[in-house]
Amino acid sequence: MRALDSYIFKMTQKPIFHKEFFAKMHMFKELEHVDVEDLSMLKLLGLPITKYNNYAFTLETLTTPIMQGKFCIVDIETNGSKPLLNQIIEIGAVMIENGKEVGEFSSLVKTDILPDSIEQLTGITLSELQHAPSLNSVLEGFRLFIKDAVFVAHNVNFDYYFISHNLEEAGFGPLLNRRLDTIDLARKCIEAPKYGLSSLTEHLGIAFENHHRALYDAKATAQVFFKALENIPEEVQSVEQLIAFTKPQNQRKKKEKTNRSTTTGTSL
């Protein structure tokens, strides 16, 4: 996890004074080319920041009810597993607002590199990719689509950090969105023999075609997300409570312990 992510997590624990917040944000290498004192820019990067009062900031997700939240269900296909060496070849996403699907994003990404194994897995051809939009244009479109919605995916860290790395390389700044893993959410809310996407959709009776195509996988993940929400505990009410509930218990305890032992500066 990035140090930047740990600091954003700190904002879920208590509001943070403006002066401390800006001073800290200036320290992160990922934000060295970002005007961190422009809140509209931070929101464009995905941070759901809002004013707590005239002196401090907090996160909108702390008070937004789940059914009024914005969730962007994302899936990517890549020509390899390493962001430093490989590239995204397709992005698919479904936007959920107020409990309903309200939009879709889908695009192939231009490249001249497509291993045979990836072509066989996805059905995407090299010719299709050679005539697709450039990576930078697709990333720009995706950033405008997701805005500050919660980034949701099945095995979320892979998709999140792959996209974030590519955004940074393109000069667009990193992702700062809150994120949620539907694998962890499903494990908390759905009894199933396996929790891979294809296994879950089969178990739940969700129609699932074109596995390993980004938009279709995102749509299937959205259906798993909706099914899981039917079984969340009554006390889980806000978007941030849902994110916290989703995390494995030992991970939550570790974060809470780290936050208590490393809190510095002046916070409300």
Task: Enumerate the language-model features and the residues they cover.
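N-terminal accessory regions of nucleic-acid-interacting proteins
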Residues: 1-69
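Short, glycine/acidic-enriched loop or turn micro-motifs at the edges of active sites
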Residues: 78-80, 184, 220
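Conserved non-catalytic scaffold segment of RNase H-like nuclease domains
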Residues: 58-60, 69-164, 169, 176, ...
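Acidic, divalent-metal-coordinating active-site segment for phosphoryl/phosphodiester hydrolysis
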Residues: 213-226
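Short alpha-helix plus adjacent loop in nuclease-associated cores
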Residues: 179-197
